[in-house]
């Protein structure tokens, strides 16, 4: 039986085209392409251009990465350069490990 893959919906909040924002986006895209190729949707929101979206989602700092789906919603604020921290913080590493086959 083939298991249906989950789709991950993520939002990345950045403040303009700063080096920190560019680095966060580049790192995140790298992680997503390696770990979740074809099963994710990423929306990048510039809080300087769309402050109302940041306010609605209660974003207080950038960069902030928010996992919307699958539930529960999870957020990581700040540095996204540590792959494992990002995956654990968004509850993605646990899901990845729990779905694997563990044989002794």
From Swiss-Prot:
Among SMART domains, the record links this protein to: KaiB (SM01248)
> Which Pfam families does the protein's record reference?
KaiB
State the InterPro entries in the record. Answer: Circ_KaiB, KaiB-like, KaiB_domain, Thioredoxin-like_sf
Q: Which SUPFAM superfamilies match?
A: Thioredoxin-like
Q: Which UniProt keywords apply?
A: Biological rhythms
What GO biological process terms does the UniProt entry carry, in alphabetical order? circadian rhythm
Q: Which family does it belong to?
A: Belongs to the KaiB family.
Q: Which HAMAP family match?
A: KaiB
What is annotated about its quaternary structure and interactions? The KaiABC complex composition changes during the circadian cycle to control KaiC phosphorylation. Complexes KaiC(6), KaiA(2-4):KaiC(6), KaiB(6):KaiC(6) and KaiC(6):KaiB(6):KaiA(12) are among the most important forms, many form cooperatively. Undergoes a major conformational rearrangment; in the free state forms homotetramers as a dimer of dimers. When bound to the CI domain of KaiC switches to a monomeric thioredoxin-fold (KaiB(fs)). KaiB(fs) binds CikA, leading it to dephosphorylate phospho-RpaA.
> What does the domain comment read?
Has 2 forms, fold switches to a thioredoxin-like fold (KaiB(fs)) when bound to KaiC.
Q: Describe the function of this protein.
A: Key component of the KaiABC oscillator complex, which constitutes the main circadian regulator in cyanobacteria. Complex composition changes during the circadian cycle to control KaiC phosphorylation. KaiA stimulates KaiC autophosphorylation, while KaiB sequesters KaiA, leading to KaiC autodephosphorylation. Phospho-Ser-431 KaiC accumulation triggers binding of KaiB to form the KaiB(6):KaiC(6) complex, leading to changes in output regulators CikA and SasA. KaiB switches to a thioredoxin-like fold (KaiB(fs)) when bound to KaiC.
Q: Name it.
A: Circadian clock oscillator protein KaiB
């Amino acid at each position: 039986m083939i298991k249906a893959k989950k789709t991950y919906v993520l939002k990345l909040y950045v403040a303009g085209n700063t080096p920190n924002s560019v680095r966060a986006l580049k790192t995140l895209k790298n992680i997503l392409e390696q770990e979740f190729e074809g099963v994710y949707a990423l929306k990048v929101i510039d809080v300087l251009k769309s402050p109302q979206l940041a306010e609605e989602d209660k974003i207080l700092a950038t960069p902030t990465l928010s996992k919307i789906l699958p539930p529960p919603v999870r957020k990581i604020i700040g540095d996204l350069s540590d792959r494992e921290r990002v995956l654990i913080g968004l509850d993605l590493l646990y899901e990845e490990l729990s779905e694997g086959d563990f044989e002794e």
